[in-house]
Design a protein with these regions (language model features):
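N-terminal leader/targeting and accessory segments in enzymes
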Residues: 1-88, 92
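Phosphate-binding loop of NTP-binding sites
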Residues: 17, 54-58, 67-177
Length: 177
């Protein structure tokens, strides 16, 4: 299941469709702003909105959670109780990226540092994918021709990240946010 019908949800759906992976779109809202667009773009997908019954949880093994969904959302608590694996698009990205990854996180300065490193790498002649919390969703960056990824990661994205080791990782200043 993909929880969150927004930019990240669309990115995950596009990736799943390319991989021929069936999916269910789920959203905690009754009328998410991009619902009609999602229904048109992904007519084979099932949609579960606002209310999540027992049948929904029994039908899924894994849930890709959009970074905008708070970690204490009751839906996530029920999913955890049911043993459903919760991941973010970050985990999928790191599993499928075939070029080195520079991952940047911290409380302040992530976008600036990500942009600067990305632009410097481009100037050196490399084909660079820049994104994550900044710019396009990570899965939209996956490309066989990319030589380097420079990714900004928010604390929300990192909460559901598993086995994500970049070639280089930078943790900028940390402060209560």
């Amino acid at each position: 299941a993909i929880l969150g019908i927004g930019a990240t949800g669309f990115s995950v759906a596009k990736f799943f469709e390319k991989q021929n992976i069936p999916f269910v779109f789920a959203d905690t809202r009754s009328k998410p702003p991009l619902l009609e667009e999602a229904k048109q773009k992904y007519p084979k997908a099932r949609f579960v909105l606002e209310r999540f019954d027992e049948c929904f949880f029994e039908s899924i093994e894994k849930m890709v959670v959009s970074p905008g969904i708070p970690p204490d959302n009751p839906i996530l608590e029920v999913a955890r109780e049911k043993g459903i694996k919760l991941i973010g698009d970050v985990t999928i990205f790191f599993e499928h990226a075939r070029a080195p990854i520079i991952a940047i996180t911290g409380s302040n300065g992530k976008s600036t540092v990500t942009s600067l490193i990305g632009e410097m790498a481009k100037e050196s002649g490399k084909k660079v994918g820049i994104g994550g919390n900044l710019g396009p969703p990570m899965l939209d960056l996956l490309d066989k021709k990319t030589e380097l990824y420079v990714i900004e990661l928010s604390s929300f994205q990192l909460e559901l990240a598993e086995d994500c080791q970049g070639a280089v990782s930078a943790i900028l200043n940390l402060s209560p946010d």
